[in-house]
Amino acid sequence: MSKVAVIGATGRVGSTAAARLALLDCVNEVTLIARPKSVDKLRGLRRDILDSLAAAQKDAEITIGCERDDYVDADVIVMTAGIPRKPGQTRLDLTKDNAAIIKKYLEGVAEENPEAIVLVVTNPVDVLTYVALKVSGLPKNRVIGLGTHLDSMRFKVLIAKHFNVHMSEVHTRIIGEHGDTMVPVISSTSVGGIPVTRMPGWEDFDVEEAVREVKEAGQRIIETWGGSQFGPAQAITNLVRTILQDERRVLTVSAYLDGEIDGIRDVCIGVPARLGREGVLEIVPIELEEDEMRAFRRSVKVVKEATREAMEAISER
């Protein structure tokens, strides 16, 4: 049984993720972390989650805290704290401020808990996964970003609806930045084991429109609901369960590249990775068509530039 700490637990994503994580059979303690001025909210959230556990007849310990000692010993540290996007903002607009928040909470974690796994959710997630890796001192396999996991699921739903099949029949991935330069990997997408481009009705599927819908999903939710909540929370729960139960599933997350894909190095970006109890067990090499690789390299360039700016910003603080 494991302890999971959620930093930024009073936010939309953090609170919802905490409630869902507490229901996992592999989790026996969830620690809710927020700033000291939010301690009353933490108390209320704790009570609410305990009520949900009672209704589900699940036994788990829910603790609250505002200090490093409250979360640094967790098996998995889920980082959701940060300034959220406002209407009209891109995720990259949040880089410098949120990089400072990552540094505040995660700097030197490896010195106190070298076995911790950090899951970064805060945007821009690819950039901040790299920041978390560098400031925490943890090895590259133990720092993971939510990345394009949810984007891939959104794309999967659109394909399933178009071909009128169950989602489980669709295998697809979106790689690259969790943002405007994300890349759909059509060349390895299949429906019921059949390459998607050979499916009847493929010619009627507008890939560009589908990708645009995936890209704009978060912004539309911000404009109408105020911000993403349930989708990211479930995606977090999926990843934490996969890690703690050592499921060894291949999921698309933001992970550190060291030459595994076309020799690309020193960047955290959305790629297929095999996940288990030690975090990233393997970056799964993926064969891309020439146009997909060009698009992926463009995405890498964007993320690397934003990452450079983030690292410079935190070095000045």
Swiss-Prot record:
Transit peptide in keyword set: no
Enzyme class at the top of the EC tree: oxidoreductase
Active-site residues, as the UniProt record annotates them: 178
GO biological process: lactate metabolic process; tricarboxylic acid cycle
InterPro entries linked: L-lactate/malate_DH, L-lactate_DH_AS, Lactate/malate_DH_C, Lactate/malate_DH_N, Lactate_DH/Glyco_Ohase_4_C, NAD(P)-bd_dom_sf
Residue sites binding substrate per the record: 85, 91, 123, 154
Superkingdom of the source species: Archaea
Keyword Transmembrane helix assigned: no
Keyword vocabulary terms for this entry: NAD, NADP, Oxidoreductase, Tricarboxylic acid cycle
Catalyzed chemical reaction(s): (S)-malate + NADP(+) = oxaloacetate + NADPH + H(+); (S)-malate + NAD(+) = oxaloacetate + NADH + H(+)
Cited Pfam families: Ldh_1_C, Ldh_1_N
Name of the protein this chain belongs to: Malate dehydrogenase
Organism encoding this protein: Methanopyrus kandleri (strain AV19 / DSM 6324 / JCM 9639 / NBRC 100938)
Name of encoding gene: mdh
